């Protein structure tokens, strides 16, 4: 079993532990806000349709605003940009809370939640710091990227659970309130660690990341992979509901995230062979193959516990795939525009999640929850086809006729 000493060496870097602690605190609410908003709005207004529409509007607004926020971070620095942007987002959350609490018109909910779109990409800023601190050390950067992906999975695994606990145990607005406080506190702790912040350039030369060679195909892969995540979540909720065990859906999805988290930490402790461009198709192929397990478990057994095991195993392909993708984004993004490049990748994922959720929901409603598990498999196959479009990867060469 690989030793985890690379992580110890990572956090021996001066300032690494401090900025990581603040960033994790700021990142945890990312898994809380959506669930908190749905529980708060649906509980007060009695409409899940309204709650879903409000959160979908916020997701769309984030897709539009996030790249601009990231561009400002690259241009003016993390501390000067992220903190004001976070204050605006926190005020948006507070406004949403007050509008729901005082029975304000529905349009105020949409406007308030849209304001939270200024939330900076905290994970991207942390990765940018690692890229700055570990410049020239590809092995250490691989470990750092793996840790960041595991942290993402952990936050998105614990966030919904914490949100549901707060809203259900205390009062419906508790999840939104605590999330806003954590976001603001974590961002303050993170941005005040100036010693590890990447330097700011008055003028950033080169093309925008969207025009950089190799970035658009990666964004297309991210879009397809987002479809995997969005469809899997919706279909699993529907499958558990059809079994009469809707309350267990969160645990089942948490197991998938746990599998990815463990795989990410193990992946970061080893030194994978070959360039990232050659590894990506293999990672996506593994994801596509393992996603067949939930489909088979649902179709052949109809057992929720077996489905949970299948999702746990399938989740183990997620982190290596995402780590490799983000490594390629870092390699291909023009110098000085790393936050923008990684935020574009996240935006692609969010767009895919929205599409996957819609297609997965339609499939479960018009066919069956079991048939819905074909959607993430199809999305993964599309991601594989897109990743194979690069003629430079070894996967393509292996399949080519001699």
For each feature predicted by the language model, list its residue ranges.
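C-terminal ends and interior cores of transmembrane alpha-helices
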Residues: 87-103, 286-301
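Helix-loop boundary and gating motifs at the non-cytosolic
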Residues: 2-63, 209-254
